[in-house]
């Protein structure tokens, strides 16, 4: 019990140091890590955020459309869209002056998440639903075959798997917290 209380107090202290954690409802503190995956999760790791992105790739641009499709609370949707805009994943564009309304479009940074979402969908189809039972599958328009994403080396074109890679750590990179603080400061 004492260990639980100590861990809880440490988390509360780290949330005080990094208010973004409390805002995002995080239960773990990745802010001191130097990790691209942890940093990415801070931007797009929330389930609502991933579903917002999924729908953006399907052409949804307006707040009301997301709310209707997802059934998400207005305050949650507004917070997720604000985070995506602050991180440059989406851009808010005014489409009506009276009443003032805006729509949200993917930036290049947001469009660069396409392979991530396609890979997640493929993984879910194969490992959650089971092969051949997925909710949605993608067909390559050019060849007409069902699409399954694979990673390839940009330099040589070889299809790769995790075991084909060597991890190189950059010791002088910023922590996740430093990166988040810089983005949130710049977006104010």
Regions of interest found by a model, annotated:
Residues 87, 116-127:
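Alpha-helical linker/hinge and terminal dimerization helices associated
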Residues 23, 31, 49, 53, ...:
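Short histidine
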Residues 69, 103-105, 137-139:
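Short aromatic/hydrophobic contact patches that present stacked aromatics
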Residues 19-41:
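Short, Lys/Arg-enriched N-terminal segment that forms or immediately precedes the first helix
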Residues 35-76:
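N-terminal helix-turn-helix DNA-binding core of bacterial DNA-binding proteins
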Residues 45, 96-119:
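Basic, amphipathic "hinge/linker" alpha-helix immediately C-terminal to the N-terminal HTH DNA-binding motif
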Residues 1-21, 125-188:
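C-terminal regulatory/oligomerization modules of transcriptional regulators
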Residues 63, 67-95, 99:
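Canonical helix-turn-helix DNA-binding module
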């Amino acid at each position: 019990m004492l260990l639980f209380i100590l861990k809880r107090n440490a988390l509360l202290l780290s949330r005080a140091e990094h208010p973004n954690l409390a805002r995002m409802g995080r239960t773990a503190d990745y802010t001191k890590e130097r990790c691209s995956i942890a940093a990415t999760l801070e931007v797009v790791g929330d389930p609502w955020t991933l579903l917002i992105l999924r729908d953006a790739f399907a052409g949804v641009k307006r707040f009301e459309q997301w709310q209707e499709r997802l059934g998400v609370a207005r305050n949650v949707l507004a917070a997720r869209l604000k985070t995506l805009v602050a991180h440059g994943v989406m851009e808010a564009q005014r489409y009506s002056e009276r009443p003032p309304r805006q729509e949200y479009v993917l930036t290049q940074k947001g469009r660069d998440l396409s392979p991530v979402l396609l890979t997640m969908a493929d993984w879910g189809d194969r490992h959650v639903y089971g092969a051949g039972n997925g909710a949605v599958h993608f067909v390559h328009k050019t060849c007409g075959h069902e699409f399954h994403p694979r990673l390839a080396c940009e330099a040589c074109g070889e299809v790769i798997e995790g075991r084909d890679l060597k991890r190189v750590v950059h010791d002088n990179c910023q922590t996740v917290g430093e990166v988040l603080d810089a983005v949130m400061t710049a977006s104010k």
